[in-house]
Amino acid sequence: MAGFLMKQMVGNQLSEVTGGLGMKDDGGEKTETGEDPEVIAARLEQEERRKEKHRKMENEREKMRQGIRDKYAIKKKEEGVAMDFTEGRIGGPRKTPEEIAAEMNAEDDSLIGQLGLTEQVEKAKTMATGAFETVKGFFPFGK
């Protein structure tokens, strides 16, 4: 640790005295990344050529795809159209919690709800569950 600190202190002072021999600022234009503008311009030009080459290749591929579609009468898939995956499913579409709640409330709209027998049905349900609990207490497998 002490050796590291000494090297840092002596190294910083030495570079100040020598003026940073490795760092030349005498007319060689450098950008903030430390590269010559010619190198940057060449890199940008190369990138543009690469992009143009890829654009041309993709256009050629699309022409080839379109030729195959025309030959075999295949329709092009639309990217913006959402696919309906429920068509080939074995089970039906899953219900959201909102749909389940709506079905529970639809019970009032059913025949029992229309006849006004909802209270009697609820009483019968509670009596049946109570009787079941009582009977279940007598049998050893119900515990």
Curated annotation (Swiss-Prot):
Residues 16-72 are annotated as: Disordered. Residues 40-71 form a coiled coil. The keyword Transmembrane does not apply. GO terms for biological process: modulation of chemical synaptic transmission; regulation of synaptic vesicle fusion to presynaptic active zone membrane; synaptic vesicle exocytosis. One of its GO terms (molecular function) is SNARE binding. Its main location: cytoplasm. It is found in: Cytoplasm, Cytosol. Residues 23-33, 44-72 have a biased composition (Basic and acidic residues). Pfam families: Synaphin. One of its GO terms (cellular component) is synapse. It comes from the Eukaryota. Keywords: Coiled coil, Cytoplasm, Exocytosis, Neurotransmitter transport, Transport. Belongs to the complexin/synaphin family. Positively regulates a late step in synaptic vesicle exocytosis. This is Putative complexin-1. The lineage of its organism: Eukaryota, Metazoa, Ecdysozoa, Nematoda, Chromadorea. The gene is cpx-1.
